[in-house]
Amino acid sequence: MKRNRWIYAVFTILIIGLGLGSRAFSSVLPDTLNTYLGDSLWAAMIFTGCGFLFRKLKTMITGIISLSFCFVIEFSQLYHAEWIDQIRDTSLGGLVLGYGFLWSDIEAYTIGIAACAAIELLVLGIKKRRCM
């Protein structure tokens, strides 16, 4: 499989915008959606970013790499040395590294990456049928 880097770059930027929007409009979104939306979008951005970087990898491998990255970041939130907490206190550091470990984040990452992988596999299936 060869992914189109332009498409994955556009999706990555679009997902970043949606993620920032989900934070800006969190006061009007339902609590259930707020629990998962931002982190699911963050994981989706990681998936599309990995798709951009590793354009020849199979969907499942891209998903595993993306999910592993998300899990490493989440579990790193259990570590609270002064230097890393200073990074987390910045806007960008907080967005990338997060603040505290939550099991709901693990669920959200899994949902976001599974959704992206499912969409990618669906699109690939449609493309294959058109070529037949």
UniProtKB/Swiss-Prot annotation:
It is found in: Cell membrane. One of its GO terms (cellular component) is plasma membrane. The chain crosses the membrane at residues 6-26, 34-54, 59-79, 106-126. It is a multi-pass membrane protein. InterPro entries: DUF2809 (IPR021257). Keywords: Cell membrane, Membrane, Transmembrane, Transmembrane helix. Its main location: membrane. This is Uncharacterized membrane protein YjgA. The lineage of its organism: Bacteria, Bacillati, Bacillota, Bacilli, Bacillales.
